[in-house]
A protein has these predicted regions:
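Cytochrome P450 substrate-recognition site 1
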Residues: 28-56, 60-153, 157, 186, ...
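Conserved cytochrome P450 K-helix E-x-x-R motif and the immediately C-terminal K′/meander segment
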Residues: 51-73, 262, 266, 357-398, ...
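Cytochrome P450 heme-thiolate "Cys pocket" and heme-binding signature region
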Residues: 122-124, 317, 435-465, 489-492
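Cytochrome P450
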Residues: 2-17, 79-86, 149-160, 170-200, ...
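Central I-helix of cytochrome P450 enzymes
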Residues: 194, 198, 203, 260-264, ...
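Conserved cytochrome P450 K-helix/beta-meander segment immediately N-terminal to the heme-binding cysteine loop
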Residues: 410-437
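Conserved cytochrome P450 catalytic core segment spanning the I/J/K helices
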Residues: 146-147, 231, 255-326, 356, ...
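Cytochrome P450 heme-binding "Cys pocket" and the immediately downstream C-terminal segment
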Residues: 337-339, 441, 458-496
Length: 508
C-alpha cells in the first residue's frame, strides 16, 4: 500500500524539456576524490520556484523528475529556503543508497501529518511514527500483513467485497448521458471498494460503501481521503512560516484528519465492545477464528490511542493503492483489447466453467499474465511517484558524499520510465515482465519500496487487485468511453488520473 504517502510530495523536481532518461552516471573512476553537495548540479532557486508555483509544477512533480534527469543527469540538488534536497534517479544509485540504510530508516524530517498528531495529542500510526516507535509497530504488524499466508487469510472476506463491487458496477451503468454500459468516474467507485475492503480486513465489519445508498459518515471519510492528499501537497510545499499567513491548506489538512480519526474511532470502539462481549465464556481460539486485524491488536494489548492511530492510517493507506491501480489497470486493458482477451482466457482457465467460481489466493498468485498486468500498471503509474530518506550517517551515492540529515528523494517515476531499462517506456506492455527482452534492473521499478520501509500492505493490496480484476473481467468486457481523449496522471501527493476515467462494462 501506500507506505510513504505523507512524504512523497517532498519530491521537488523541476526543469524544462522531457527527452530521454538514459543519462550517464558520470562516474569519474574509482581513484577520484568524492565530491560534496556543492558539486551537485541543479536549478537555481528562482527557476525552481517558478517551475513549482508558476507553471503548475505541484501537479506534475512526476514529470519534473523526468525533466530533471534530462537536464542534470541522475543526481541533482535543489534548495527551498534552508531545505536542500538531493534527487536520485538511477536504479543503481537508488540501490546503493538503500543498501546503506540502518535498522530504522528515516524519511522526511518534516511531516504535517505528524504535526497534526502532536497538536491533537493523537498517537502516531505506522505511517507517521519514526525511530523506536516505528520499529515496534512494524515488528508488531509485519507477521499479520507481510507474509503471503497472512494476506491469504482474508481472501474469503475480500471475495464478498469483490462480488458487491461487481453488483455495484452493474447498478452504476448508464447513469447520465452516454452508452448504456458506461460507468462514470470509475476511480470514485474503486475508492468505495478500497475502503470497504480494508475496513473488512481491519475491523471485520462492512461499512456499506458499495450499497445503493452510501452512509453519510462513509461519504465524509472518502471525501476526506481525497482532500487530505491535496492539502498535504500544498502544506509541504510551503515553508512553515507561511502557514500563518496562508492558513487554508493547513486548516483543511487538520479538518480532514479529524474527520478520519472520528470515523475510525467510532468503528474501533464498536468492534472492541463486540470482541469483549463475544469473548465472555468462549475459548480464545473460538474468538480469534477468522478475526479481523484490529482483534489481533487488541490481543497484543496495544494502548487504545495507538490502535486508533494505526487503524486510521491503515484505512487511508488501503484506499489509494487499490483504487488508483485498479482504475489505471482497467483503463489500459480497455485500450489494449488483445491483452484483455488473453488475460480473460487465463482467468477463465483458472476459474473453471461458470462465472461464479472463486479461485483461491494461491491460484491467482500463480497466473503469470495477471501478475504481469499488475506489475506493468504499477510501473507506469506508481502510487507514490517519489520516496524520501534522511540518512542518519554520511553516505556515498555515486561520486558524491551525502551528509547525514540531508533530505534525499528517490525518483521512482523517472526510473520506471527510463528507456534504458524499459524499451518503449510509455507503452503498456505486460509481456516485458514475462521474459520479453532483457530484464530491467531490480531497483528500476519499486512501487512498494524496498527493505525495512517497504509497503506493509503489499501482499494484501496485490491480493485485492488480483481478485478484483479476475471477477470484473469474468463478468464484463471493459471498453473505453467512445471518443474519449487519453487520460494522463497528475500528482496529488500520490499519482492520480488528471480527470475522470469513464469506462464501459459490457456483460459477457
Amino acid at each position: 500500500m501506500t507506505q510513504t504517502l505523507k512524504l512523497a510530495s517532498r519530491v521537488f523536481h523541476r526543469v524544462h524539456r522531457a527527452p530521454k532518461l538514459s543519462a550517464s552516471l558520470g562516474s569519474r573512476g574509482s581513484d577520484s576524490a568524492p565530491r560534496s553537495l556543492a558539486d551537485i548540479p541543479g536549478p537555481s532557486t528562482p527557476v525552481f520556484l517558478a517551475e513549482l508555483f508558476c507553471k503548475g509544477g505541484l501537479s506534475r512533480l512526476h514529470e519534473l523528475q523526468v525533466q530533471g534527469v534530462a537536464r542534470f543527469g541522475p543526481v541533482w540538488l535543489a534548495s527551498f529556503g534552508k531545505v536542500r534536497t538531493v534527487y536520485v534517479a538511477a536504479p543503481t544509485l537508488i540501490e546503493q543508497l538503500l543498501r546503506q540504510e540502518g535498522p530504522r530508516p528515516e524519511r522526511c524530517s518534516f511531516s504535517p501529518w505528524a504535526e497534526h498528531r502532536r497538536r491533537r495529542q493523537r498517537a502516531c500510526g505506522l505511517l507517521t511514527a519514526e525511530g523506536e516507535e516505528w520499529q515496534r509497530l512494524r515488528s508488531l504488524l509485519a507477521p499479520l500483513l507481510l507474509r503471503p499466508q497472512a494476506a491469504a487469510r482474508y481472501a474469503g472476506t475480500l471475495d464478498d467485497v469483490v462480488h458487491d463491487l461487481v453488483r455495484r458496477l452493474r447498478r452504476q451503468r448508464g447513469r447520465g448521458a452516454g452508452p448504456p454500459a458506461l460507468v462514470r468516474d470509475v476511480a470514485g467507485e474503486f475508492y468505495k471498494f478500497g475502503l470497504e475492503g480494508i475496513a473488512a480486513v481491519l475491523l471485520g465489519s462492512r461499512l456499506g460503501c458499495l450499497e445503493a445508498e452510501v452512509p453519510p459518515d462513509t461519504e465524509t471519510f472518502i471525501r476526506a481521503v481525497g482532500s487530505v492528499f491535496v492539502s498535504t501537497l500544498l502544506t509541504m510545499a510551503m515553508p512553515s512560516w507561511l502557514h500563518r499567513l496562508v492558513p487554508g491548506p493547513w486548516g483543511r489538512l487538520c479538518r480532514d484528519w479529524d474527520h478520519m480519526f472520528a470515523f475510525a474511532q467510532q468503528h474501533v470502539e464498536r468492534r472492541e465492545a463486540e470482541v469483549a462481549l463475544r469473548s465472555k465464556g468462549k475459548p480464545e481460539e473460538d474468538v480469534g477464528s477468522g478475526a479481523h486485524l484490529t482483534y489481533f491488536l487488541f490481543q497484543e494489548e496495544l494502548p487504545a490511542p495507538s490502535i486508533l492511530g494505526n487503524v486510521t492510517e491503515l484505512l487511508l493507506a488501503g484506499v489509494d493503492t487499490v483504487s488508483n491501480t485498479l482504475s489505471w489497470a482497467l483503463y489500459e486493458l480497455s485500450r489494449h483489447p488483445e491483452v484483455q482477451t488473453a488475460l480473460h482466457s487465463e482467468i477463465t482457465a483458472a476459474l473453471g466453467p461458470g462465472s461464479n467460481a472463486h479461485p483461491s489466493a494461491t491460484a491467482l498468485s500463480q497466473l503469470p499474465l495477471l501478475k504481469a498486468v499488475v506489475k506493468e500498471v504499477l510501473r507506469l503509474y506508481p502510487v507514490v511517484p517519489g520516496n524520501s530518506r534522511v540518512p542518519d550517517k554520511d553516505i556515498c551515492v555515486g561520486d558524491y558524499i551525502i551528509p547525514k540529515n540531508t533530505l534525499v528523494t528517490l525518483c521512482h517515476y523517472a526510473t520506471s520510465r527510463d528507456p534504458a531499462q524499459f524499451p518503449e517506456p510509455n507503452s503498456f506492455r505486460p509481456a516485458r515482465w514475462l521474459g520479453e527482452g532483457p530484464a530491467p534492473h531490480p531497483f528500476a521499478s519499486l512501487p512498494f519500496g524496498f527493505g525495512k520501509r517497504s509497503c506493509m500492505g503489499r501482499r494484501l493490496a496485490e491480493l485485492e487487485l488480483q481478485m478484483a480484476l479476475a471477477q470484473i473481467l469474468t463478468h464484463f468486457e471493459v471498453q473505453p468511453e467512445p471518443g474519449a481523449a487519453p487520460v494522463r496522471p497528475m500528482t496529488r501527493t500520490v499519482l492520480v488520473p488528471e480527470r475522470s476515467i469513464n469506462l464501459q462494462f459490457v456483460d459477457r
